[in-house]
Structure formats: structure tokens, C-alpha cells
Amino acid sequence: MRVGIGYDVHKLVADRKLIIGGVHIPYEKGLLGHSDADVLLHAIKDAILGAAALGDIGKHFPDTDERYKGANSLELLKEVSNLIKSKGYKIHNLDATIIAQKPKMASHIEQMRANIAAAINVDMDSVNVKATTTEGLGFVGVGEGIAANAIASIIKA
């Protein structure tokens, strides 16, 4: 078994959709980024790539490449899953945490889990997503951004 960790953060700004875990979350702001800025899926992709010692999303999907402008992170997650399969691995388990003061994530968690499980072709019981706040502290606490971290375990297929 191999394990990787991932972390991502994006700034909250006006005039952007808030997409987390492939779910559009109604909110007054969205995350700024080259792609859809799905902070959760970015952390998960980095964790999977790290577990396979295949670098990070910046290497595979650089923000200098116009092909990835506005890209759907669920589609890129499928690409990462296919890449590790081509290297002889399969995803065993994912655990991720969204760190956001607002909006509340609880009502969206199950759909996020379903989206992730479908994208990487695993059962939902292999995917855990949870959310927490920073109790008003730091850039997340004052509503300037949202962060996520993830851990992935992979095994030989």
C-alpha cells in the first residue's frame, strides 16, 4: 500500500461559481482559479498523484496551459485515476477535509462523495469527505478563501 497527501487553497471572489467536490454550491462568492477551482478535487488529485510518486496537478495540468482554463475538475480526476491505473495501481481509500467558514457544507457532502466515487470508479464506502471551520481564525475564518486537504491510499491492481 502507498499513501499520498494533498492540500489546496483558493481565494473567494465575486462573480465566480462555487464548485466543491463537483457540486455547485449556492453562495455569494466562488473560488478563483485557472480551472473550475474545485479546491477539494485539487487536493484529492494531488494526494492520488503523490501516492503513485507521479508529481502533482501542476505538473499534469499546468495553469499555463489554455486547455485547462475553466476545466471541470471531475474530468481531470478521471484522468488522474486512469493514469495511476496505467501504472498498475488502484485507489483503495480517500479521506478529505474541506476547511471553510462559510458556506456550510454538510448538506452537500453525500453528493460530493458520490461524484468522487463515480469519477474514480470505486464504491462510496472508499471515499470520505468532511468539513470543518477555523473558528473565525486566519484567511479561511475571515472568509477570504477555502482550503482542503486529502489523503489517498493506493494498492497494486
UniProtKB/Swiss-Prot annotation:
Keywords per UniProt: Isoprene biosynthesis, Lyase, Metal-binding
GO MF terms, alphabetically ordered: 2-C-methyl-D-erythritol 2,4-cyclodiphosphate synthase activity; metal ion binding
CDD domains: MECDP_synthase (cd00554)
Cofactor: a divalent metal cation
Catalytic activity: 4-CDP-2-C-methyl-D-erythritol 2-phosphate = 2-C-methyl-D-erythritol 2,4-cyclic diphosphate + CMP
Binding site for 4-CDP-2-C-methyl-D-erythritol 2-phosphate: 8-10, 34-35, 56-58, 61-65, 100-106, 132-135, 139
Residues noted as binding a divalent metal cation in the record, renumbered to the chain: D8, H10, H42
Subunit structure, interactors included: Homotrimer.
Official protein name in the record: 2-C-methyl-D-erythritol 2,4-cyclodiphosphate synthase
Originating species: Alkaliphilus oremlandii (strain OhILAs)
